[in-house]
Amino acid sequence: IIMYKIISISFLNVFLFGANLEIGDTAPDFRLKNQDGVFRKLNDYRGSKLVIYFFPKAETPGWIKQACGFRDEFDNFQDHNISIVGVSFDSEEDLKSFKEKYSLNFDLLSDTDRVMGNAYAVNKWYFFPSRKTFLIDESGILIHIFDDVNLHSHSDDILKYFNHK
């Protein structure tokens, strides 16, 4: 009975929160609508490096700082063939409004069903994904995970990682 309970709890954790990803894993595929209602999937970014960052909620002070950091460094990311995608559980409409308000120059994906959040194991809280960033290489392999995100220097930290790789 004890073994059954352990297996049941383990299965429940994976079901609710996703399996932990590790460096070298193939990045989980996704198919989500962006702020304009256009479906995006992992394969759309094949051939370039990809930053996928999860954020709790649009219009929160921390996320504004983080998003604007990516916006301000966008040309540097492009120079290194790096695409950027932000993901939250917000609606397409909320993300569109947020993108326009802050003149963001990259896609925001709406994961209202928490499918991508589960695949990337960021569903720490039901209503908000945990703040986590995944770096993926040109062939779709996970090469780095930022578990601790410094909102003030996050875009610079990512660029430094790629410059030293």
Predicted regions and their residues:
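Sec-dependent N-terminal signal peptides
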Residues: I6-L16
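N-terminal "domain-start" segment that seeds a small globular fold
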Residues: F17-N43
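Short loop/turn microsegments at loop-to-beta-strand junctions
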Residues: A27-P28, K49, S130-K132
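Short active-site neighborhood of thiol/selenol oxidoreductases, capturing the structured segment around
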Residues: L42-K65, F70
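Structural microenvironment flanking redox-active thiols in thiol-disulfide oxidoreductases
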Residues: I64-Y102, D113-N118
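Structural micro-motif
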Residues: N105-F106, K124-F134
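Thiol-/selenol-based redox modules, centered on thioredoxin-like
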Residues: P129-K165
